[in-house]
Amino acid sequence: MTNPRISIVIPTAECEGKKFLPRCLNSIKSQSYINYEIIVVEEGKVAYNMNCGIKKATGDIIKILCHDDYFNGPLALEEIAIAWKGGWLVSGCVHDTGAEEFVMTHYPGWNDHIHRGFNTIGGLSVLAFENKDPLLFTEGLDWVVDIDFYKRAFLRYGLPRFLVTPNVVIGYGPHQTSFKLTEEQRTKEINLMVEKYGL
């Protein structure tokens, strides 16, 4: 597919991380690849919020980009478009601690135990997937909303296409919602994944 249209879904919420939304949007405006649409959604809990954005998407590819994350340079969307082969794609990323200091470069990989909390893919903003009867996120999950999606994407499409270029920057710090979840909630959701997919 040449020149695929990319729907960039940006879930946001009234929280501390929302202050980073302008940085996210500016990183999109600086892209050399221009066949995209931006869908900013603020509809409630994480999974429901993203699902609302997915349902509004008109592009060939749905690209998740959380409001506190941003593209790593002007070629990020073009890299996705060039690498795209259908199904799903995950990219490498770096982390920004808040002072635009990049740390912890992460290269995605697959493991069959991802549903048990061994997330070797990365955060939601590394994800792109096809907009053909698209997968939706499982509502009611917070801690494992990403790995549950990755497991179901694998079961539908097989392995993702790996874009090892770190083309996304993950905003890392205490503003992240995942830091606010209790250990009890995390354990409960991991147990749900084991019940659903096995050991």
Can you describe what each PLM-predicted range is?
Residues 50-51, 72-135, 174, 179-199:
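Flexible acidic/His/Gly-enriched loops in nucleotide-sugar-dependent glycosyltransferase catalytic domains
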Residues 62:
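Short aromatic/hydrophobic "clamp" motif used to bind/position activated sugar donors
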Residues 4-9, 37, 148:
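Cell-envelope/extracellular polymer assembly enzymes that use nucleotide-activated donors
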Residues 76, 149-153:
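Short active-site alpha-helical segment characteristic of glycosyltransferases
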Residues 43-57:
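Glycine-rich, basic loop-to-helix element that forms the pyrophosphate-binding segment
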Residues 143-149:
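Acidic donor-binding loop at a coil-to-helix junction in glycosyltransferase catalytic cores
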Residues 23-35:
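Short, acidic, metal-binding catalytic loop of nucleotide-sugar glycosyltransferases
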Residues 92, 160-168:
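Catalytic beta-strand/loop signature of glycosyltransferases that borders the donor
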